[in-house]
């Protein structure tokens, strides 16, 4: 892994560069506060938890006001040989074998993290669009 190059990658990503759909924006609003330990772990790898590479469509629980995001993917610069799969609370984090192509110059790999149980911001987003 190349933590410094990973940090540079995330420093260049603005919120408006992320998917603008309500589901992704809801995740970005809530994930860091809901999962501070995961955010801290990802930050130790150079990853900004609020700048996902890819988000798998969530399942909404209307009765409880939460969504389950099964997989959130993040890019890490460098070689994956020194990355180790881990689990933080209920969140499993490992190397992805299924992801879109990244428009990133240089060696990199993608990690999967999930399942994230995230509050639905009905006050801010319409999830019926």
Model-found features: residue ranges?
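Primary mode marks residue(s) on the alpha4-beta5-alpha5 output face of response regulator receiver
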Residues: 47-50
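N-terminal cysteine/histidine-rich coordination modules
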Residues: 1-44
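Generic structural motif
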Residues: 26, 79-83, 123-125
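Predominantly extracellular/secreted and cell-surface proteins with exposed
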Residues: 52-56, 60
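Short flanking/linker segments adjacent to small metal-binding domains or redox-active Cys/His motifs
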Residues: 59-104
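Residues in well-ordered beta-strands of folded domains
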Residues: 22, 77, 119
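Residue-level marker of intrinsically disordered, low-complexity segments enriched
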Residues: 1, 74, 89-91, 109, ...
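Glycine-rich, aromatic-bearing surface loops/beta-hairpins
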Residues: 96-129
């Amino acid at each position: 892994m190349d933590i410094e190059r990973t940090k540079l990658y995330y420093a260049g990503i603005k919120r408006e560069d992320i998917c603008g759909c309500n589901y992704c924006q809801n995740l970005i609003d809530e994930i860091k506060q809901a999962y501070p330990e995961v955010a801290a772990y990802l930050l130790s790898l150079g990853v900004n938890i609020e700048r996902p590479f890819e988000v798998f469509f969530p399942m909404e629980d209307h009765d409880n006001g939460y969504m389950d995001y099964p997989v959130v993917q993040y890019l890490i610069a460098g070689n994956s040989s020194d990355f180790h799969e881990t689990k933080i609370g209920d969140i499993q984090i490992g190397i992805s074998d299924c992801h879109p192509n990244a428009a990133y110059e240089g060696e990199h790999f993608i990690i999967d993290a999930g399942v994230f149980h995230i509050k639905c911001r009905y006050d801010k987003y319409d999830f019926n669009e």
